[in-house]
Amino acid sequence: MEFDLISLLWGLPAAFALGWLASRFDLRQMRLENRRAPKAYFRGLNHLLNEQHDQAIDAFIEAVQNDPDTSELHFALGNLFRRRGDYDRAVRVHEHLLARADLSAHESARARHALAQDFLKAGLLDRAEAALLRLEGTPLQTDARLARLAIYERTRDWEQAAAMAELLEDAGRGSFQLRLAHYRCEQAATLRQQQHTTEALVLLEQLVQRIPESARAWVQLADLRHSLQQTEGAWAALQGMVQHVPGHLPLVAHNLALWGKRLGRTQAVRALLQQWSEQHAASLDVTQALVSLEDDAQAARALYLEHLRREPSLVAASLWLGGAHWGSPAEQKLVKPALERACEPLKRYRCAGCGFEARQYFWHCPGCQSWDSYPPLRIEEI
């Protein structure tokens, strides 16, 4: 008994010393690892600032290995993989985050939203939508609905897009009325292609009553009525557009003049176009519509001169020269095609968002997928 007591007394200090040494070793190891993690993290940030994405990824991978429980490092690494186009690795990082049992509800929602973004970028729209649907009822619900709206636009699911736009507007994320009008116009265009003209007509007539600020709805309604030999109704639709969305009149100036003449309302159309010209910047489309109403060639050419007094225009100058007799026929044959080629790019429309140029007017930019990003002006007039 005495021997056991003496052994115990000697053993306690030894055990304490060994424990202290072990703790010091673990503490030093922990400090070393914690020192490595911030260094790797800041090194990754430095590479990011220098736009060295590959080196930044390597640094963040090292930081994650040294500190695997830090969710922010995982988010940074996953987002880097996505920006680099390495979607498989981005998905794995965010799925690994979601599998962690210690993740808070907020971080779990963030990880699921990031995962949905990975799927979106990879073109896996079904999986992206499934991930976004699971964010209903979370703080990221509105962001998820915006992403779902983008999916429905890409898949041309206009009914779902319309429903989502109304939910977003109800949530106070701004006005989606014009966007909603575009969705309904797309549906009307589809109905017309399928020969369901009556349904398309009803849809557009209801639309201009609900959202009269939609220039596209008025234009499509006028075009559909005209195709049904309803010239009076088509003319009325164009007048409605001019009343509610006057800035878009240049898009329909030609049809206003053409249909107005057919209905015997040349003077009314001329007065309307002249009044618009006095209140807005010079528009070549409006000038050409006024020219089409003139029977006298000299009076028509005078309209181009009036346009040039208000706004220098190579296109207007070319059209004015086109009606004049100058030089020999051989000289005219040489000069006129050159002028026309020089004017051609100036007649195009240009997206204000991405700069995509097109000969026709687009309501939805084929380049950046923005709605209403084309001003109703030619490039020369911008």
PLM regions and their residue ranges:
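Long, contiguous interaction/recruitment modules in multidomain scaffold/adaptor proteins
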Residues: M1-R35, A130-L133, G137, T142-L146, ...
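Alpha-helical segment of the N-proximal tetratricopeptide repeat
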Residues: E33-D69, A76, R82-D86, R92, ...
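Structural register within alpha-helical repeat arrays
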Residues: R43, L77, L115, R148, ...
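Residue at a conserved register position within TPR or TPR-like alpha-solenoid repeats
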Residues: H47, F81, F119, Y152, ...
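Short coil turns that delineate tetratricopeptide repeat
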Residues: P68, D102, H106, P139-L140, ...
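TPR alpha-solenoid repeat register
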Residues: L73, E107, A111, A144-R145, ...
